[in-house]
Amino acid sequence: ETLLARLARARSVLVLTGAGMSAESGIPTFRDAQTGIWSRFSPQELATPEAFARDPGRVWQWYEERRKAVRSAQPHAGHRALVQLETMVPDLTVVTQNVDGLHQLAGSGKVWELHGNILRSRCHLTQRPIGSDWLADSPHSPPRSPYVEGGLARPDVVWFGEVLPTAAVEAAAAAASRCDFCFSIGTTSLVQPAASLPLVALEHGAALVEINPAETPLSPYASLSIRGKASEVLVTLVSEFAAWTRHNDA
C-alpha cells in the first residue's frame, strides 16, 4: 500500500511543525534572533522567568523586536498546502512548537501551540491575558498589568524552565494516539515533549512522513524521510494527493 493510499484511508492526521516551518516565512529561529546588540546575551539571559525578574525591560524589548519580525511575516505555500490538506481528510490537527500564529493566519482550523504565542501577552502574576489595546496605551516597558499592583505584561510564551500549557500538551498527546498518519515538519526532533509525539503515533500504528532539510534522530523511524524545504515538499505532496484522490474516486 502506498503512502498516498494510507493518507487517503486516514481518519485522523497529525501535523507537527517546528522552527524550520517558520524560517521560510522569514522568521528567524530563536538562535538567529540573537543578532546585533542581542548577540552578547545567552538565551538564558533573555527567555527565563529569572531574566524577566532581573531585567523585565530588557526581556520585553527583545520580544518587541521579535514581534516586529512576526508581524511582518506571511504564511508561505507550505502553510497554505496544510490548509488545503485539511479539507481533504476527516480530521487534521496541527501541533506547533512555533510561537508566530502563522498556521492560524493561513487558515488552519485546529492548531495547538505547545510553546505559546509571541503576539499574545499575559500578566506575569495572575497569568490572565492582557489585550493589545491596553498594551498600546501603556507608556511603560513592559506595560503594567491591569489586574494587580506590581504585575507586568509578559509574552505569552513558554520560557526555559517553565511548564508547557496543559491543554495543548493533552490535546497533542491525544492527537498522536488517535492519528493514522503523522507529518513531522521542520523540527529537529530534539525538544521534548514534541519530539516524542511522532513516536507515540508510530506506536499506535500511524504512518510517519518527515520533512526536514537535514537528518534528525527521528529519520530512521520514518516511513518516508524527505530532505527539502517544507513549502516546496508540502505543495508537491498535497497536489499529488489531490491527483491520486481524483483518479481513485473516478
Q: Over which residues does each language-model region extend?
A:
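Conserved catalytic core of sirtuin-type NAD+-dependent deacylases
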Residues: 1-250
